[in-house]
Structures are given as C-alpha cells and as structure tokens.
Amino acid sequence: MKNFTFITLGFAVSVAAVEPKFRAQEIDAKVGVGYGLQLADMDGDKKTDIILCDKDKIVWYHNPTWEKHQVSGHLTKRDHVCITARDLDGDGKAEIAVGGQWNIGESNDASKSGAVFYLNPTTDRKGNWTPVQLPHEPNTHRMHWIQSGKGKFDLVVKPLYGPKGADGRKRGAKVWAYHMPKDPTKEWSRILVSNFMKDSHNFHPIDWDRDGREEFLQAGLNGVYWFGRDKNDEWKYMQFSQNYAGEVRDGLTARGKRFFAAIEPKHGTTVAIYLQTKAQFWQRRVLDETLKDGH
C-alpha cells in the first residue's frame, strides 16, 4: 500500500511539472475594435467556437477551421460594447445578446447612450440574425446570461455609470434582469436587481451554493458585492470588500478556501485577492502593485 501511494504521488508531481505549450494562430486580421469575446458552441457540433463583438458587427469563427460567419452588422450608430453567448434551451447551440451605442459621456439620455439586443438566430446559424431591441439604461456596458433555475436563464445587464444628478455627481446604476418569453420577439419582462452601485466596470457569474441558480459578483466604486436570489426569487446582496475595484473573478485555494481576485481601482495598478472569513469583509492580500491600466 505504501509503495502504491508513493508511485501515485510521484506521478502526480511529474504531471504537474509539465508546462503547457501554445502556438499562435491568426484567425482574423481585420478586426475593427474588438470589445469582447465569448466561447460557446454555435452550431451544435460539440466544438467550442469563438464569438466576437466588433465595434460594427458580430461574428463567430467555426472551430477548427475558424471560418468566419457574420451574424449582424452595425446595430447602433455608435460602437457595440459587450456580448454574451450561452446555450439557453439545451439544444447545444448558443444564444447571443449584444450591448451597443457605447457613449461613455452620456449617462442620462437613453436615446443617445446604450442599447440592448437579443439576436434571433437563423436556422443554419449563419447570415444576419434578427435583432430584437430591449429597453435599456444609458451607458450599457456589460451583460451575462445568468441561470435562474433548471433550464431557465435571465439576461442581466449592467451600465457603467448611473445618471448624473443636479450636483454633477453620478448616481448608482440600475442593473436589470430580463426574462425571455417563449417567443423572443414579444415583450420581455424584467426585474430591477440593484440601483446603488457606482462606477461599476464588471461583474462575474457564480454558483457557490450549487443550487442551479447562479449569483454574481459585481465590482465598482463601492467595492465588491455578491448578488443572489432568495427562496422567493427576490434579489439580495452582501458586501465583501470596500476598495474601489474594476474587475472581479472567483476561485478556490488548494485547500478549498474560497476567494475572489480584483483589480483595484478601475483600470488600476493593483491585483488583490480576498480570502473568505467569518467577518463581513474578506481578508485582503495584495499580489501586485505594478499594473498599468489593469483589466
């Protein structure tokens, strides 16, 4: 038994020591301004494709040939800014939503800033998909398909800034969860998730309790917050940190302790991790303070 254990551990160490090797492969040299990428199976062949949100079009590249398929031209007068892709109905093919009309200087007038679209796919997943425009807040900036139950998903959309008040200061931004009807061309219902986060650059889906309903972490001027639903499907929140943060991702240590990593502040210089504690605010550890314009 001892020899067997020794051999097993030795094998594990040798495997862990092997460094992965990668080679660069250019698949498109004609990207305008690439605002976002998603990885998902677009045509049901069980291979992960690449979906690109370019400033004036939405395209996907077919794995493994990387053949390019444009599914949308310019949806708004200004740039597209974000995209989310995920299989919502279990058919093995991802659905797409897009944010556009990127206008960082306008956070009050929704006719001049922000846009949210669901792209209704063609049968062959090629050609121009039909855009379905949804209500939106100004400054549309990030979005995710968030699982709300077994086989159910909401489109959660976050602006960068909230509206500017009479004193010239920006208020909290409204984050909405959109629910798709059976016919996506019909009216979508939506629920207000929050309205207090200021200067919020990004958010990240999680499912810490593994109940099939996802939560998310959101980074902003206020710090990093957790948002999730209770048993009555009402949105609740908890604050885990107070430092101004622009990016956030979660993980587990080798011993299984939960943590999240953040770039502080927005477009900042510092990488910090926060280890879960019994206290409200998690334990902060700085990893690096030499970043420039960290994303």
Predicted regions and their residues:
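Beta-propeller-forming repeat regions
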Residues: 17-295
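Hydrophobic h-region of N-terminal signal peptides that target proteins for export
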Residues: 8-18
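Positively charged n-region of N-terminal signal peptides that target proteins for export
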Residues: 1-4
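Terminal non-domain segments
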Residues: 7-8, 207
